[in-house]
């Protein structure tokens, strides 16, 4: 099959997938988002959105960043759940994506055979995209939404004047979501830009991976990962990155994906806004890395340019703008002056850079237990070790799995053992089982399953 036919087939698959979204069984609605933001508020917050104000310099004539597109993106991406398996100190993450409405799962990131046989304890965690501004803390949901709005507003603003929210003609906030893609680039002049050598997500030399959408998704490896997550096909967006600037719903999904998905060793923006990431002591020389809050979203999104001790003023000025936008949206969502001030007190910060001696640094230590420091009841954490083993397994679980049953099956599907998890540290004797491959499943909402090697 020639390249043109492959290109056409991927476009057809994208179109069919978009239609299929409307035909799938309904998934749980994101009530947190629905309770915090309305279409009327959206229109007041972003009156200069692309395609809604004057003659748009990038040619948009329809409301690309409409509230309807955002709402559809939030609801549809809520159907996705990601399982991440990691072994501390062992290269690779085994990541699976599941569509909850259909039960269909597919690999997002694979590992080598050596990973499976390495006896290092395995940690499993889940990223449920229904959790976007929708966890148990209404206060943190508001903080997360304000942080999300601040960052997408900054990335796309056509404004030029401070103070944020001051109502001037060039108010940065009023011009949020004005630009759809990065200035200076178009489909016709961008071949090869933002392309990095990457064996897993190789760039297509005929296209460019400049910033597109609310979060300004950039670089081939980000387009490839998002495409794999969304469509189980990395090449759809590697070959057709313009889809992110032509489909408003997909554009918002790209922003939510980037926001919710941890990219080792970075935590996700969602995690840091819900205090679900705790840095290891002594891992960082910069004390600012041990502060919590909004500053980390800046470090995750564009820290290499804006948040380093060596960052140029043109970039550190953007740190201040993000902070001001965040505080502005907190006020819109009902925070009073003292609550907004608290975002820079008691170990929290809205600024990833304050001076050459007080700035953030790169993230290190890809550990899921750090990334989920405060575990909510709907987050299942499981460890099984040693694996392989000849005698005993130790099963470590989070508190919410106490009372659940586990089952062990042989490689032809016959159940060979079952019991109740009565402790967060349970020893399981498999000494009498023949050597071979087994599968341990926990009877819980997510039914995590582990491949066990009996030697």
Where in this protein do the model-derived segments appear?
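Extracellular low-complexity, O-glycosylation-prone Ser/Thr/Pro/Gly-rich "stalks"
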Residues: 29-47, 279-288, 292-293, 299, ...
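Peptidoglycan-targeting cell-wall enzymes and recognition modules
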Residues: 30-261, 289-293, 297-310
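GST-like fold's C-terminal all-alpha helical module
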Residues: 257-274, 278, 293-294
